[in-house]
């Protein structure tokens, strides 16, 4: 099933208004603090490291370009055309194949798999802010892209992140400047409980190969100058 038009328009609006400079978006932390840490956890579980890598929900492509420095073929896919405009402008070397794709739409993931074959998947912070009806189709789409040989690294805000975010949103001074646009566009982060994620994985015919906890680093800082980090959970997935 396709995502709702409201959800799609929320992300188009967000990325149309987002600044282009690095680190201007709340979750756009430098790869050394994000994809670099994730890759160290992911690579030991890649059964076929030579497969193409697809970054689902790539946004402006910061992490995707990092992956492209390390793997021979990398695709960045996103629901938002405006996000992909940012990503292509930042990819001066043309390292990444950026495409608009709804990963929860079965026909689109099947078409991509038919073209590319089995893939390794990287997805950071997408499921937790999806609308409820879109969550299972997203995991089903990942299963399609993985095929038999692929592995997925999925990192999502844990349920423990919600009170942290709500505390930031309700502070007397208002939410931090980089977090405010997320709420302003009607995007609701940290909406999925941990047990539900495991259920979506199982229903998609996937198995959890490895799992752990790691703070999701943001580009925003608290009033005391410390960087805001959100509790998150990572999973390595494979066909069951």
Predicted regions and their residues:
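Class I (Rossmann-like) S-adenosyl-L-methionine-dependent methyltransferase catalytic domain
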Residues: 1-114, 132-137, 141, 150-240
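Conserved helix-to-beta-strand junction in the class I
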Residues: 144-146
């Amino acid at each position: 099933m396709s995502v709702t038009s409201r959800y799609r328009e929320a992300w188009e609006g967000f990325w149309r208004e987002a600044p282009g400079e690095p680190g201007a978006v709340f979750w756009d932390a430098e790869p050394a603090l994000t994809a670099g840490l994730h890759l160290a956890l992911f690579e030991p579980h890649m059964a076929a490291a030579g497969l193409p890598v697809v970054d689902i929900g790539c946004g402006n492509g910061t992490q995707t370009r990092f992956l492209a420095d390390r793997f021979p073929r990398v695709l960045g896919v996103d629901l938002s055309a405006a996000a992909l405009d940012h990503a292509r402008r930042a990819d001066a070397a043309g390292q990444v194949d950026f495409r608009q794709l709804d990963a929860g739409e079965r026909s689109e993931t099947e078409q991509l798999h038919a073209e590319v074959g089995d893939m390794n998947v990287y997805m950071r912070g997408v499921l937790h802010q999806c609308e409820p009806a879109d969550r299972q189709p997203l995991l089903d789409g990942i299963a399609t892209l993985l095929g038999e040989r692929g592995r997925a690294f999925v990192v999502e805000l844990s349920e423990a992140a919600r009170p942290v975010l709500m505390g930031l949103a309700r502070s007397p001074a208002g939410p931090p400047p980089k977090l405010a646009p997320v709420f302003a566009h009607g995007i609701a982060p940290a909406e999925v409980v941990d047990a539900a994620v495991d259920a979506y994985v199982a229903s998609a015919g996937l198995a959890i190969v490895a799992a752990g906890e790691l703070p999701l680093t943001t580009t925003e800082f608290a009033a005391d100058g410390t960087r805001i980090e959100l509790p998150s959970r990572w999973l390595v997935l494979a066909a069951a």
